[in-house]
């Protein structure tokens, strides 16, 4: 067995079950393990949903139980400047961003990693993400988590080989029920704590109410694909492609009983376009992506077949990548796909290996 006793690992302790069990597993592997709790959002006293205090208390209870030191750090300024302002700008532009991906890029695997290495003397950081690291080729590769239902590689595609090489993912080889079973055996306070959802670090708020605090309402028309105005929306930012609930346009006498879907957002006209049923306008043959991040940091310069996900927990889509330049690619799907959404990430795979990804700039219904 490898002697890890001189290797210091700082675990990002979120107050959840995955990071709790990650810390324990690293202890079992003989590492010097300490925890770090990151506060990345300043909650005011009037906030109905205050999660950070409870999460910190849970993280501290786990560290006490495991005999670990817990450090705390406030990255709220970095989060606001590097994640949240971008998030708001994207919504203003009528796009649908994924803050979790940017949060991993700017906070967990940049600010946290640098702080752990430079200030705490860590060789590695560790997180409770459901991904795996593979060093068998001599270069660190990012693999999907063993639990296909929980795999989080989609959110970590911006990582470089160097960042993967400085990170450990102890629960990546386990399935979620096994992680909970370990936590229950250890009698950890987080054993039955439900998984966090909602915006990274901000928590489970009513999204529309939360967004309204920062972005003013921008009402505009709801139009059918034929150009008929049938309602009003309060802001394109509140709607996503493929959405069918909360449109407020049901029960029309001049329509069939089929559900209405959002099929487009025309930002220039501030218009939400809807159609009934599985309308062709919802489907795309491919996409253009930019702001590319390849894990090995080598641009793709020749056509390449692989698979892609255009949203989390989606089935892999066989596709062909055609490079336009080092910063932009065209992706052609083998079969048409619904609700490909600008602002979201397209993440590429070769089997178990996460190759990297980029931001969806546009979708197309014929090769462009």
From Swiss-Prot:
Residues given in the record as ATP binding sites: 12-19, 38, 128
Assigned GO CC terms: cytoplasm
InterPro entries cross-referenced by the UniProt entry: MnmA-like (IPR004506), MnmA-like_C (IPR046885), MnmA-like_central (IPR046884), MnmA-like_central_sf (IPR023382), Rossmann-like_a/b/a_fold (IPR014729)
Catalytic activity annotation: S-sulfanyl-L-cysteinyl-[protein] + uridine(34) in tRNA + AH2 + ATP = 2-thiouridine(34) in tRNA + L-cysteinyl-[protein] + A + AMP + diphosphate + H(+)
Primary site of residence: cytoplasm
Superkingdom of origin organism: Bacteria
Interaction with tRNA as annotated region, ranges: 150-152, 311-312
Keyword annotations from UniProtKB, A to Z: ATP-binding, Cytoplasm, Disulfide bond, Nucleotide-binding, RNA-binding, Transferase, tRNA processing, tRNA-binding
Coiled coil region boundaries: none
Active site: 103, 200
This enzyme's EC code(s): 2.8.1.13
Molecular function per GO: ATP binding; tRNA binding; tRNA-uridine 2-sulfurtransferase activity
Cellular location(s): Cytoplasm
Any one Gene Ontology BP term: tRNA wobble position uridine thiolation
Site feature (Interaction with tRNA) residues: 129, 344
UniProt-annotated stretches for the region Interaction with target base in tRNA: 98-100
Covalent S-S links between cysteines: 103-200
One Pfam family from the record: tRNA_Me_trans
Role: Catalyzes the 2-thiolation of uridine at the wobble position (U34) of tRNA, leading to the formation of s(2)U34.
Protein family per UniProt: Belongs to the MnmA/TRMU family.
Protein name: tRNA-specific 2-thiouridylase MnmA
Record lineage: Bacteria, Pseudomonadati, Pseudomonadota, Gammaproteobacteria, Aeromonadales
